[in-house]
Design a protein with these regions (language model features):
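Protein kinase glycine-rich loop
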Residues: 15-23, 27
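Protein kinase catalytic-loop region centered on the HRD/HxD motif
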Residues: 123-135
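C-terminal lobe helix-coil module of Hanks-type protein kinase domains
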Residues: 180-265
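Activation-segment/catalytic-loop signature of the eukaryotic protein kinase fold
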Residues: 82
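AlphaC helix of the eukaryotic protein kinase fold
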Residues: 45-70
Length: 265
């Protein structure tokens, strides 16, 4: 555990408790003693960047954080500050009271069309602001969609995937969790586009309605192969009674070719 409870970081942020452990970071609840508000601190794992890659990672990490901080939208988790603690880079963000979409998926398995479209609509609204600011998320998945205590979407981790994937040579571990949502052009050409974010949203919506992702496989390589070489099955194959307009909307979001998807969120 990097930051014990009660520890004060940079003479300002007092750690209250650990919220979550992820592959690339540990997240803590903390209090910004200068402003007297609760914040979330994401401390990046040091093994992500060692030696000569370290400087590159730090520069990219701070650049991505600056980009994310420039996006103003109620559906995006605000970034307040960045810094270094014990040789580890950290991000200070708005603290969201609530759960992530993955937690909700585990609780209720499938969602109504109305609820799915509401969550998708709010996610697209947040992404539209980001894309206008020139920021692509690259890693949209249920774990990065937070639902606050009023049930509204707040997207987290903008640009972190970019900073991390370029710092780790073996990004296969990262791929595993994310492969189910990655757009074909991202897999084939490492090409991050706004339309790639839309594809990920489409897969997520498919999963919310069907209770499972459209493609499954025993390993990430096979899974990635399917995203590149197969069309996402029509949602009506999993949910026969679904509205034709909704099915057509999902088909556009999850089109294999970038140019067949909507041009913007």
């Amino acid at each position: 555990q990097h930051a014990p409870e009660g520890q004060v970081i940079e003479g300002r942020y007092r750690v209250v408790s650990r919220i979550a452990d992820g592959g690339m970071a540990t997240v803590y609840q903390a209090v910004d003693e200068r402003l007297g508000r609760t914040v979330a601190i994401k401390i990046m794992h040091t093994q992500l960047a060692q030696g000569p890659q370290r400087d590159q990672f730090v520069e990219r990490f701070h650049r991505e954080a600056r980009s994310a901080a420039a996006i103003a939208n109620p559906h995006i988790v605000q970034v307040y500050d960045t810094g270094e603690f014990d040789g580890l880079d950290f991000l200070v963000m708005e603290y969201v009271h609530g759960v992530n979409l993955r937690y909700e998926m585990n609780q209720q398995v499938t969602f109504s069309v109305r609820e799915t479209l509401r969550i998708v609509g709010e996610t697209l609204d947040g992404l539209a602001s980001a894309h206008r600011a020139g920021v692509v998320h690259r890693d949209i998945k249920p774990e990065n969609i937070l639902l606050n205590d009023r049930g509204h979407v707040q997207i987290t981790d903008f640009g972190l995937a970019k900073a991390v994937s370029q710092a780790t040579l073996s990004s296969t571990g990262m791929l595993l969790g994310t492969a189910a949502y990655l757009a074909p052009e991202m897999i084939q050409h490492n090409q991050a586009t706004p339309q790639g974010d839309l594809y990920s949203v489409g897969i997520m919506a498919w999963e919310m309605l069907a209770g499972k992702v459209p493609f499954t496989a025993d390993n990430p390589v096979t899974l990635v192969f399917k995203h590149v070489h197969e069309d996402v099955p029509d949602i009506t194959t999993a949910c026969p009674g679904i509205n034709a307009g909704v099915a057509a909307f999902l088909a556009r979001l999850t089109a294999r070719a970038v140019e067949d998807r909507p041009q913007d969120a």
